[in-house]
Structure formats: C-alpha cells, structure tokens
Amino acid sequence: MWIGIISLFPEMFRAITDYGVTGRAVKNGLLSIDSWSPRDFTHDRHRTVDDRPYGGGPGMLMMVQPLRDAIHAAKAAAGEGAKVIYLSPQGRKLDQAGVSELATNEKLILVCGRYEGIDERVIQTEIDEEWSIGDYVLSGGELPAMTLIDSVARFIPGVLGHEASATEDSFADGLLDCPHYTRPEVLEGMEVPPVLLSGNHAEIRRWRLKQSLGRTWLRRPELLENLALTEEQAKLLAEFKTEHAQQQHRHDGTGDA
C-alpha cells in the first residue's frame, strides 16, 4: 500500500515510519509513505501558508495555492487510482468497518489541515472523502492521519505477525475483544481462567466468544443493536448475563443467609 501525506509537519510521521507495526511494514516494503509540505510550494520569502478568512472571524485558513499544488504533486506521484482524504471533524466517523473499507485502496492521499481548516472550494475540487476520528477538535490533521494509517496498515497482508490478528481485533466482527492472559498463571491471587489452560480449543473458542459478547454488552451495548446474533451467540450472551447477575449478587452480599 502507498500513502501520500500532505502536511505542514511531515516530520511528525516518523512516529509511523520508524516505530512499531507500521515501522516494520515500511522496512519490509509492505507500506510506503511519502510526504509533501505546502510550504515547499510557496512563492514568497516567508513561505506563507495561511491567510485570513473572508467574512472575518478568529483564526486563519490554509492558503489555497500551496495546498492545491502539494495535492497535485502527490496525485502526480501516485498516478491513477489514488483516493484523496481530508481529515476533518465534519467527516464520516472512522470505525472498524470504515478501516476495512479504506484498506481495500492501494493508494491513499491524506490531507492534514491546520489553523481553522481549508477553503471549501479545495474540498469540492480536490477531496474525495472526509473522515473524522471522533467528535472533538485537535490542532491539526496529523494525529488523525496517523491513527488512520496505523489502523489500515493492520489489514495489509504480512504486516501482522499472526495472520488472524486483524480479524480477531476488537470491532473486527462488531464486538469488543475478549480478555487476554499471559504468564504468570497466578498474579497476586488472580488466576488465569482454567478453560484457557485446558487445551480444549472448542471450549476456548466458546469462552472467548462469550466474553466478547459480554464485554460488548457491558461496555458498548449500542454495538449489539446493529448485530443479528446467531443462535449460539444469543445463547452465550444469555449465559453471560446470568453469570454476571450472580456475580453481582454475591458481590453485593445479598446472597448471604
């Protein structure tokens, strides 16, 4: 996968290219990231990249000409088929389904805004889609772009150490992930669930699915509203709810004689 970045601070993306899963993907040639700064497309000695908005008001906007020229340079480098995305709080909210959708693109160009944003006409003429990572305001589009890159890169074949990792992540099937455990077997009196030590893969799968359903019900119940549960899932969720109620009953001490 190739990703082009339009940013006034391209050096921020070293966090993506030099470290972790994405850094390994770049090193192994599975992910390629190039960047263009609008400052390199200015024509004045101050390398000005911002301008006042028409109609007044606080703040500045990114200048049209340097931004458009940077986008055009990225498009030229990408060739045909690159989708141009503007990271914006007004865009479609990124979720796992959206990540999976974006991962089907071989080429992406991510435009990172600064100041109060960019000229609406640039959005109309240069941008294919707007995406947001949440209902809050950041100082620029770089962190959302890095979030998008990291999440999308996990779907590139060969990037993750275990091929099933991306499909088993939280939200991959619309549910939160189940709890995970590693050594030691007992930590300050807390034991690993015995089923995980049993070697019974069918029971382990069933336990993990039950915990995934239950954790989603407890923490993000709205996610279940959009899911058509299978007969097995509905049964496991009912079991979890019963077990949870019993645990709460014992915890509250109301079960004492």
UniProtKB/Swiss-Prot annotation:
Q: Which positions carry the signal peptide feature in this UniProt record? A: none
User: Main location per UniProt?
Assistant: cytoplasm
Pfam families per record: tRNA_m1G_MT
Supply one GO CC term from the record: cytosol
Q: What does it catalyze? A: guanosine(37) in tRNA + S-adenosyl-L-methionine = N(1)-methylguanosine(37) in tRNA + S-adenosyl-L-homocysteine + H(+)
Entry's InterPro entries?
A: Alpha/beta_knot_MTases (IPR029028), tRNA_m1G_MeTrfase_C_sf (IPR023148), tRNA_m1G_MeTrfase_TrmD (IPR002649), tRNA_m1G_MTases_N (IPR029026), tRNA_MeTrfase_TRMD/TRM10 (IPR016009)
* Disulfide bond residue pairs: none
Cellular localisation? Cytoplasm
* BP-aspect Gene Ontology terms: tRNA N1-guanine methylation
Listed EC numbers: 2.1.1.228
Superkingdom, natural source:
Bacteria
GO MF assignments: tRNA (guanine(37)-N1)-methyltransferase activity
The entry's keywords = Cytoplasm, Methyltransferase, S-adenosyl-L-methionine, Transferase, tRNA processing
UniProt-annotated binding residues for S-adenosyl-L-methionine: G113, I133, G134, D135, Y136, V137, L138
Quaternary state and partners of this protein?
A: Homodimer.
Task of the protein: Specifically methylates guanosine-37 in various tRNAs.
Give the UniProt family note: Belongs to the RNA methyltransferase TrmD family.
The protein's name in its UniProt record: tRNA (guanine-N(1)-)-methyltransferase
Say which species the protein is native to: Cronobacter sakazakii (strain ATCC BAA-894) (Enterobacter sakazakii)
The gene coding this protein: trmD
